[in-house]
Regions:
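A helix-centric hydrophobic-segment signal that preferentially recognizes long
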Residues: 1-184
């Protein structure tokens, strides 16, 4: 067999091996991102499950605060219907804002703050918010690793051809970045 042909075949086999290895690496990173996203969804669902109990507890003391309760319900519905990372991120920001307003309403009712059920729900909500923050961080780290990988040589040459594209970060909406005004 021709020596040049052997060199070409060997080079093609090496290139094929590198592409397959890179492909498998991208598949693994993509699945890692999907797993991290599932963890965010699990924590968001946990928070969603806590909210009705919290709202009902506050309603018992502050029934006339219907606009706050409606904002929480609307934000929960929007989060439940989110289909993309951007929609979920936006809805999560709205729900966090509505929950903050709900907890501010609770501050006006000393009997409510002394209610053991309310205190327990508030603690569970705080713990869940912390788990959501950690899950977001893990997700965004996985997305950053994946996005960096598909932009690096030689992966950039074949990632798009094999169906891999940049993934979206779970970003905080602009409304959540605003510093709340506190008046004494």
């Amino acid at each position: 067999m021709n020596k040049n042909l052997m060199i070409v075949i060997a080079a093609l086999l090496v290139i094929f091996g590198l592409v397959m290895s890179g492909y498998n690496n991208l598949v693994g990173m993509n699945e890692n991102i999907n797993g991290k996203w599932s963890q965010i969804e699990n924590q968001l669902q946990r928070r969603n499950d806590l909210i009705p109990n919290l709202v009902n507890t506050v309603k018992g003391y502050a029934a006339h605060e219907s606009d706050v309760f409606k904002a929480v319900a609307d934000a929960r519905a929007k989060l439940g219907g989110a289909k993309t990372v951007q929609e979920a991120s936006q809805a999560d920001g709205e729900l966090s804002g509505a929950l903050s307003r709900l907890l501010m309403v609770a501050e006006n009712y000393p009997q409510l703050k002394a209610n053991a059920n309310f205190t327990q729900l508030q603690d569970e909500l705080a713990g869940t918010e912390n788990r959501i923050a950690v899950s977001r961080q893990d997700y965004n780290n996985a997305v950053q690793e994946f996005n960096s990988s598909i932009k690096q040589f030689p992966t950039v040459l074949y990632a798009g051809i094999l169906g891999f594209s940049q993934r979206d970060y779970f970003e905080v909406p602009e409304s959540a970045k605003a510093v709340p005004q506190v008046q004494f």
